[in-house]
C-alpha cells in the first residue's frame, strides 16, 4: 500500500510540474505562437522554470528564436495585438510601418509579474525572438537584470 501511495504522489507532483507552465500562459494569445512554432524545424524554443532560474529570480522563462520566417513574425504580431489590450505598459519600436520591437508589461497573475518581449531583425537575416517571463520582481527590475547579465 505504501508503494501505491508513493506512486500516486509522484505522478501528481510530476503532473503539476508539467501543467504549471502550460497554465501560466493560458490567458495569453502568444501561447498560440509557442504551440505553433515551438517544435518546427529551424526554431529554437527554450523553457526554463524553478531551480534552472535561481540566478535570475524568475519563476518561468520561455523563448522562441525563429530564423527566415517573416510569416511567423506577422502571426506573432497579431497575437501581441490581442495581448496588448490587457497590458499595463506598452513600448514599441516601429520601422517601415511595422513594429520590430515590442515590450508588454502584463497585469500580475497572483504574485507574479509577467512580461513579453518581441524583437525582429531583417539584417543580416530575418530573425525573430519572442520571450515570456514570470517573476516576483517588477518588470523594470527584470529588464535591468536581463540587460546586466549580457
Model-predicted regions and their roles:
Residues 23-112, 121-126, 139-140, 144-150:
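Polybasic/polar functional segments that serve as interface/processing modules
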Amino acid at each position: 500500500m505504501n508503494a501505491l501511495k508513493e506512486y500516486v504522489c509522484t505522478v501528481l507532483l510530476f503532473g503539476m510540474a508539467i501543467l504549471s507552465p502550460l497554465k501560466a500562459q493560458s490567458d495569453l494569445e502568444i501561447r498560440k505562437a509557442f504551440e505553433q512554432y515551438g517544435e518546427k524545424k529551424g526554431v529554437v524554443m527554450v523553457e526554463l522554470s524553478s531551480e534552472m532560474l535561481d540566478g535570475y529570480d524568475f519563476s518561468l522563462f520561455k523563448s522562441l528564436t525563429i530564423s527566415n520566417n517573416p510569416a511567423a513574425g506577422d502571426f506573432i504580431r497579431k497575437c501581441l495585438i490581442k495581448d496588448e489590450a490587457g497590458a499595463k505598459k506598452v513600448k514599441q519600436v516601429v520601422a517601415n510601418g511595422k513594429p520590430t520591437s515590442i515590450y508588454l508589461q502584463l497585469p500580475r497573475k497572483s504574485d507574479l509579474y509577467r512580461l513579453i518581449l518581441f524583437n525582429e531583425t531583417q539584417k543580416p537575416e530575418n530573425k525573430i525572438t519572442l520571450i515570456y517571463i514570470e517573476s516576483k520582481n517588477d518588470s523594470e527590475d527584470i529588464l535591468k537584470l536581463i540587460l546586466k547579465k549580457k
